[in-house]
């Protein structure tokens, strides 16, 4: 049976012997680790142990499983470790095992203590005389990445780097020392902070405050109010710019397109571009398109406005039904070869084939 435990009280060795007792075992091996009173000429008063309890118990159980896989005759295994302050001469760890023969017990205990020092997350702190802080110690058996023996020796590198470079003053934009540069950065940050604060006051603070109150220490965090703007879901002010001239004023100027066409099309100021356009462009083609699109035809209307109406109608139809443009089949040109027609062959059943063969036989015999 496995007995694994982390204790805060002194470990009872007699209780350990009771856990190992078994009628079929002829040997019991017990290792007891205690606190010594010196280390490298320093007087040790006590040891302080800390552990990651759940992980430590898990690893200790794994050690027991490893012991039983290597030594199959082990009967009982005990691993007790003490936490907290452990004075001199008191036991901090006890590892014991019982088996029918002494070799398995001795070898398993030696293997277990090495694995405990290597794998279990328990940390030790030595308290010295005259030093209340103490010093954390590392087990020499703990697994740590070894330093590479083939490390690069930078001291033997023949490369030399020139540290002094003369930079032309024309390439230096800021010619101040570190203190002045730090001062400028702080001033810039403070100014930006003040701008943000002032904007927050404008956007968040209520303007309906009595003038007799001192507002020097007020802020948006303590006096914030949300003023809903008209026709808006946001409390911030939204402004719309109305241009006094340009395409946005076409509704206010009915003759804007006509004036623009005259301005862009007239050369000598005497010819009418609309009449010239009517003469050059066959009006019948546009009328056919308008009738196909279901639009009313007005020959007196500007040609560009009529084309624009057709384009808007196409966009409307495609937005309502995106597959609209796929419904119109383009007629093939006379130059293009007509695609071959697919002829579906008739499939015959077995009875029809038998009857057909029989007719052929009857005809041959008849002939």
Swiss-Prot record:
Functional pathway: Cofactor biosynthesis; molybdopterin biosynthesis
Superkingdom of this protein's organism: Eukaryota
Subcellular location: Cytoplasm
Molecular function via GO: molybdopterin synthase activity
Keyword DNA-binding: no
Matching InterPro entries: MoaE_sf, MOCS2B_euk, Mopterin_biosynth_MoaE
E.C. number: 2.8.1.12
GO biological processes: chromatin remodeling; Mo-molybdopterin cofactor biosynthetic process
Binding site for substrate: 101-102, 117, 124-126
Catalytic activity annotation: 2 [molybdopterin-synthase sulfur-carrier protein]-C-terminal-Gly-aminoethanethioate + cyclic pyranopterin phosphate + H2O = molybdopterin + 2 [molybdopterin-synthase sulfur-carrier protein]-C-terminal Gly-Gly + 2 H(+)
UniProtKB keywords: Cytoplasm, Molybdenum cofactor biosynthesis, Transferase
SUPFAM superfamilies recorded: Molybdopterin synthase subunit MoaE
GO cellular component, one term: ATAC complex
Subunit structure: Heterotetramer; composed of 2 small (Mocs2A) and 2 large (Mocs2B) subunits.
Miscellaneous comment text of the record: This protein is produced by a bicistronic gene which also produces the small subunit (Mocs2A).
Reported function: Catalytic subunit of the molybdopterin synthase complex, a complex that catalyzes the conversion of precursor Z into molybdopterin. Acts by mediating the incorporation of 2 sulfur atoms from thiocarboxylated Mocs2A into precursor Z to generate a dithiolene group.
Similarity field: Belongs to the MoaE family. MOCS2B subfamily.
Name of the protein in its database record: Molybdopterin synthase catalytic subunit
């Amino acid at each position: 049976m496995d007995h694994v435990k982390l204790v805060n009280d002194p470990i009872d060795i007699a209780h350990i012997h009771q856990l190992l007792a078994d009628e079929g075992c002829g040997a019991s091996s017990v290792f007891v680790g205690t606190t010594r009173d010196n280390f490298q000429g320093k007087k040790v008063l006590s040891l302080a142990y800390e552990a990651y309890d759940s992980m430590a118990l898990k690893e200790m159980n794994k050690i027991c499983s490893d012991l039983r896989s290597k030594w199959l005759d082990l009967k009982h295994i005990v691993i007790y470790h003490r936490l907290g302050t452990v004075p001199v001469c008191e036991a901090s760890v006890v590892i014991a095992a019982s088996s029918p023969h002494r070799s398995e017990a001795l070898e398993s205990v030696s293997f277990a203590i090495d694995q405990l020092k290597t794998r279990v997350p328990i940390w030790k702190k030595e308290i010295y005389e005259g030093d209340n802080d103490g010093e954390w110690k590392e087990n020499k058996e703990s697994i740590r990445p070894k330093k590479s023996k083939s490390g690069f020796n930078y001291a033997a590198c023949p490369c030399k780097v020139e540290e002094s470079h003369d930079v032309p003053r024309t390439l230096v934009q800021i010619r101040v020392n570190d203190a002045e540069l730090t001062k400028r950065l702080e001033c810039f940050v403070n100014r930006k902070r003040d701008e943000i604060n002032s904007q927050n006051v404008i956007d968040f603070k209520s303007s309906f405050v009595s003038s007799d109150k001192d507002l020097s220490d007020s802020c948006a965090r303590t006096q914030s109010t949300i003023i809903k703007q008209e026709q808006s879901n946001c409390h911030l002010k939204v402004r719309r710019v109305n241009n006094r001239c340009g395409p946005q004023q076409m509704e206010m100027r009915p003759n804007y397109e006509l004036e623009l066409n005259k301005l862009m099309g007239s050369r000598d100021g005497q010819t009418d571009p609309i009449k010239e356009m009517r003469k050059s462009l066959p009006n019948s083609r546009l009328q056919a398109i308008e009738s196909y699109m279901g639009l009313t035809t007005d020959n007196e209307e500007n040609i560009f406005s009529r084309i624009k109406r057709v384009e808007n109608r196409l966009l409307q139809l495609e937005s309502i039904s995106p597959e609209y443009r796929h419904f119109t089949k383009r007629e093939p040109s006379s130059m293009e070869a007509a695609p071959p027609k697919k002829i579906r062959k008739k499939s015959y059943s077995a009875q029809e084939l038998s009857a057909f063969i029989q007719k052929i036989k009857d005809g041959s015999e008849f002939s």
